[in-house]
Amino acid sequence: DAWLWYTVTASDQLQFAIGRDEALHMLNYGNLMAPIIIALCANSPVYAGKLSPFCSAREGVMADIRAVEHRHGMLPARFTSLHDFVRTLSQPTYLIAKAGGEVVPSSRPFWQHLLENGPDFQAFLFHEHYIWNSARLRAAYGTLEVRPACQQPWGEHMAAAALILGL
């Protein structure tokens, strides 16, 4: 099952409240800091019972998922405006859509859904939930989520969160 591997990845994600005026700057900064966070917090090179070539197997494995869409990890460029943010997030495939009260697979870009159905904020929120950049705005919650750190040993379980918040 293509989705099964999601059940065995573990990251240490931090969400914090963010205002509209600072959202893009902090989103761009969070993505820029991803390699540093990974370098300082990676501790999971094992995947599927074998040593992977990555210091963080989760980051390495997820990087291959629809890589051309930049669905995971860092984006190829910073966001320049909220319009640019929405336009960029509308390019990837709308993986899972809601139709007639049911959740169904989809294989078309999200912009195509918008073209056919008009503005649809609820659909956008559902779509952006399945885009896993190292830092991502969570519009439904008014937060920025920074997500590339591996889970830390219990004695240091707050270290990654403190680092991310401090940055």
Task: Give, region by region, the residue ranges found by the protein language model.
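Short cationic amphipathic helices and targeting signals
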Residues: 12-17, 146
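C-terminal accessory/tail domains of diverse enzymes
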Residues: 5-6, 20-167
